[in-house]
């Protein structure tokens, strides 16, 4: 078998087509109902085996550091704990805006995990990657799977749905970064009037949806984010 020295992968963004917050769990997280949709916007990740035997990281942005707050680094550490892999150099070209809700960091983590599996020929399935990747972030499992998924639990419980859409997504990202922890901390009033999950999925029939038939899908975070960041 030919051993790989380098892999280059696209790390795709996502949009949430509606997001309902249901309740706060005893572990401090929130149960949600949402639809994750993978989109073409992507970062680029190149993983190269390193002769130095250590992990190295580089990027076109300065705000990403070589520490565990960087989800590329966290993903490498997660895989290394299981397989004791050698060192690599991870280069990340960022195109997805941070704090935009497009899942850039989680996507990067999932892509690094899949890239490490490929370059080191690791015998680990997507399902197994999904299970361990939730330790990094609640929506990382979605990026292991991709396509279109109903997300429940904290976002890690995924159900594939058929999704037919004609047209394009228009992604507008103002110069604002929304911290996820802050957004969840402001959400108590929304939870008091949260719509049950059964209502959220009333527009589905047989887990098949056509976006052209949907007039509007609400995102509960809008009620706390828009007043603070009207732009």
Spell out what each predicted region is.
Residues 51-65, 112, 134, 209-219:
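Short, basic/glycine-rich phosphate-binding loops at helix/coil junctions
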Residues 73-88, 114, 215-231:
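A short, flexible low-complexity segment enriched in Lys/Arg and Gly/Pro that occurs
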Residues 100-131, 142:
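DPxDG-like acidic metal-binding loop motif
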């Amino acid at each position: 078998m030919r051993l790989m020295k380098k892999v280059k992968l696209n790390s795709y963004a996502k949009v949430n087509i509606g997001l309902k917050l249901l309740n706060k769990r005893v572990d401090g997280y929130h149960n949600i109902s949402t639809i994750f949709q993978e989109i073409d916007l992507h970062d680029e990740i190149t993983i190269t085996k390193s002769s130095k035997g250590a992990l190295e990281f580089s990027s076109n942005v300065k705000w990403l550091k070589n520490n565990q707050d960087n989800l590329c680094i966290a993903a490498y550490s997660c895989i290394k704990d299981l397989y004791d892999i050698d060192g690599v150099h991870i280069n990340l070209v960022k195109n997805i805006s941070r704090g935009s809700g497009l899942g850039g960091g989680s996507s990067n983590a999932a892509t690094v995990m899949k890239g490490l599996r490929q370059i080191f020929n690791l015998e680990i399935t997507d399902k197994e990657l999904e299970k361990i990747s939730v330790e990094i972030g609640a929506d990382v499992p979605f990026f292991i799977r991709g396509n279109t998924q109903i997300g429940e639990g904290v976002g890690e419980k995924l159900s594939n749905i058929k999704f037919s859409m004609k047209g394009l997504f228009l992604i507008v990202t103002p110069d604002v970064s929304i911290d996820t922890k802050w957004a969840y901390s402001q959400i108590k009033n929304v939870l008091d009037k949260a719509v049950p999950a059964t209502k959220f999925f009333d527009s589905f029939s047989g887990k098949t949806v056509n976006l052209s038939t949907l007039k509007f899908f609400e995102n509960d975070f809008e009620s706390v984010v828009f007043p603070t960041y009207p732009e």
